[in-house]
């Protein structure tokens, strides 16, 4: 058994080359390990995001039994609002659990090199 792939989107969101708004990057960099939550479980479209006004409202509506259409209306355009416009309070800030461990912006080259160095160390243990 072994890993065949990894999903590292959150790490690359804060890469120097990434076009994500600086507010989005900083929200991830400042995140703690307990700052993410999963929304969308009730409608079969779960996503992990960082807590903010949008996610709290979404979870409240979900808990109250809101339907797919109502939840969809709330979130239409919200990812763009966060990623492109930088509205990290009312937009959806998608990020994995790893967000709490990301503490700085790096180039893609630095990220890949760091991952490879860590993998090599682990494989030689």
Regions found by a protein language model. Give the residues of each.
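Conserved active-site-proximal phosphate/metal-binding subdomains
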Residues: 1-125
């Amino acid at each position: 058994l072994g890993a065949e792939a990894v999903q590292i989107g959150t790490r690359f969101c804060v890469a120097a080359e990434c076009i994500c708004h600086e507010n989005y990057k900083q929200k991830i960099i400042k995140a703690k390990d307990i700052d993410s939550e999963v929304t969308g479980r009730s409608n079969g479209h779960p996503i992990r995001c960082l807590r903010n006004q949008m996610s709290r409202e979404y979870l409240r509506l979900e808990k109250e039994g809101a339907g797919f259409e109502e939840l969809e209306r709330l979130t239409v355009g919200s990812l763009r609002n966060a990623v492109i416009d930088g509205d990290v309070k009312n937009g959806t800030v998608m990020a994995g659990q790893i967000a709490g461990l990301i503490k700085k912006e790096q180039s893609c080259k630095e990220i890949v090199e760091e991952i490879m160095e860590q993998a090599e160390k682990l494989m030689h243990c």
